[in-house]
UniProtKB/Swiss-Prot annotation:
Coiled coil: none annotated. The gene is CYCS. It comes from Macaca mulatta (Rhesus macaque). The modification N6-acetyllysine is found at residues 73, 100. One of its GO terms (cellular component) is mitochondrial intermembrane space. The keyword Membrane does not apply. InterPro entries: Cyt_c-like_dom, Cyt_c-like_dom_sf, Cyt_c_1A/1B. The modification N6-succinyllysine is found at residues 56, 73. This is Cytochrome c. Disulfide bonds: none annotated. The modification N-acetylglycine is found at residue 2.
Length: 105
């Protein structure tokens, strides 16, 4: 599994402009990610998702996030997430390690 501290830096640089992770955190352009692991796509309470996200029907976990974060628009065509993805598998693993910790505190 990845490095939590490196993952935190990646989150701050590439994700925090649109997402929060803390319990009770506000939705920004993207949804708050608290409780992400084990949740189905398009299910953060109070966030307005595209039909593509709601209908994808997968449960977020290490494997699904690894694939999604490489190329979000390929994994969920029609998502409104404009992020191009993270090509390096090691960086995705670091980010997922951080998300696993930060979205569960």
């Amino acid at each position: 599994m990845g490095d939590v501290e490196k993952g935190k830096k990646i989150f701050i640089m590439k994700c925090s402009q649109c997402h929060t992770v803390e319990k009770g955190g506000k939705h920004k352009t993207g949804p708050n990610l608290h409780g992400l692991f084990g949740r189905k796509t398009g299910q953060a309470p109070g966030y307005s998702y595209t039909a593509a996200n709601k209908n994808k029907g997968i449960t977020w976990g290490e494997d699904t996030l690894m694939e999604y974060l490489e190329n979000p628009k390929k994994y969920i065509p029609g998502t409104k997430m404009i992020f191009v993805g993270i090509k390096k598998k090691e960086e995705r693993a670091d980010l997922i390690a951080y998300l696993k910790k930060a979205t569960n505190e």
